[in-house]
Structures are given as structure tokens and as C-alpha cells.
Amino acid sequence: MTQAILLCQSHELADSSLAVPFKVHYFGKNQAAFAVRYQGRVYAYLNRCSHVPMEMDFQPNQFFDLTGHSLMCATHGATYAPQTGQCRLGPCRGGLVKIEVSEAEGLVHWHTSDKFQLPL
């Protein structure tokens, strides 16, 4: 059974701006995750590059490149589509791991699943 877990208020996520960080329990470990807004919609992913499993932000909660149209790994420069997490350019092995989110009545929630649970 899935749960909707409050992440933030909608106004905390501006288009192509800072992310809101959160934690999830994924395959036996607490992992960093982040949510961003792009072209009016909210997306969330594990904070883990698909090239080398390390956190991607080069400054706290900063994932967008200078164009504001790609999420970028600060370590190797791999870029990802904000809408899908798919690799656009650089050393990638697949895409980012997506976390389901919803937005209603001024609130953003992330959703537990068989893969993602509340952190321990």
C-alpha cells in the first residue's frame, strides 16, 4: 500500500531553481533524494548519478545547469532531462531513479512504493 508523504509547500519549488531535498529508504539504505519544478510540474529523483552512484548537486540543492533545462551531475558533467530523468549527455548508464510525486491544494507529496519507503 502506498502512502503520500508531505514534502513541501508548492511555493517552495520555483521553475528551474533550487531543489527540495528529502530522504527515502531504497533497497535497504536511507538515500538522499530531491524534488524540482520544471515547466510548471514537479519531479523527484534519487540524488544519485547513473554513471557513478554519488550525489549530484554541486552546491546544496542546486541541480539545474546554467540553462535551467537540464539536471547536471557536478562530478562528471552528465546531464539529465528534468521531466524523465533520462540521460541527455555525458557519461551515463541509464537515467535517474524516479520517485512518484503529486501536487494538490498548494502541497507537494512523494509516494511510497515497493521500492521507496520512509527512511529508518
Residue ranges and their predicted role:
Residues 1-66, 81-82, 95-120:
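N-terminal pre-ligand scaffold of iron-sulfur
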